[in-house]
């Protein structure tokens, strides 16, 4: 809301819509609160920046499982698990899991190209520590899942849920803003896993974060 000419009433409505179970995109928000698409987009960018600030600071603890996944346009119907295509965005999904392997905290982060083997979707050996450093505390017990261990874990299902949410709500996202949407998804997922009250959690989030300009 810092330096904004948009009324507090419309900001409050935007927060309420974003905090709803369905969430909101810029097209929907512009129609709901009667502002230009550019204004709605700017409002949501600031609100999601607040979410990202919190989510980026929360690293996974305990036993952490992770896997390399990817988001690809629908026309890449022949996408393989090894070769990387130009439009694919490579994502590390990680979760703190209980003794039964069930996740209770989730992280999704874009993997920098320099951490990957050239031309592939695989982490380079020297890139693994940096990749885990983006999702887990240094003393976490970590495991990078591949092959049968990955298939038998909950991670593929969790990632597909996130992918469906992204496509349903935003109909495809460019790389520039993808991480902010991944943060939003994780915030929602982790809040639900904790059994938190959505209105209280979102109010606490939005009214404690410094201005984003």
Pin down the residues of each PLM region.
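Residue-level recognition of single "structural anchor" positions
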Residues: 1-213
